[in-house]
Amino acid sequence: MYICIAKIEKLTVKENISTLLAEKCVGIAGAGGLGSNVAAALVRSGVGHLVIADHDTVSRGNLDRQFYFSDQKGHPKVYALQENLQRINSATRLTLFYGRVTTGNARQLFSGCHVVVEAFDMAPEKEWFALWMTENLPHIPLVMGSGIAGWGLSEKIRVQRSGNLYICGHQLETNEKEVPLMAPGVGL
């Protein structure tokens, strides 16, 4: 993500990074294991505005790898995440959408972003969103996660780039029974 922003701005001076990040807007499609943790990292890094979209609610099964707490069970993820992010940095502007991202609303949600992170759980959602972004908002870098929800294999994580599409992960198929969904991979 930071690579995308830095390439957009051709940054060379470290002191400019804080100012640059404070002026940027990052969209996050999905507020689960990847999206909630990316949001926390971006807020801690000083990104000025996040657009976060998700249709799900916090459940007990989310607590081992997502940036939520047990007292937030049953709450919409975007609102629970807002509460948590504001505790990190209340100056960060948050635009929230509680609902499914669709071809009918994706442009309205993400066209004002400098970078968008695809953080959906399911492969079909990832696929349509990547195709939609590259066809409809090709000027906006899209960062996708693939195969990073477990543990181990961290030495195989790579970034593959094609135009404004960045795919981060090891892109290997793993069996959830052998490598369960856990926080370590997402934290990388």
Regions found by a protein language model. Give the residues of each.
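Adenine nucleotide-associated cytosolic modules
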Residues: M1-L188
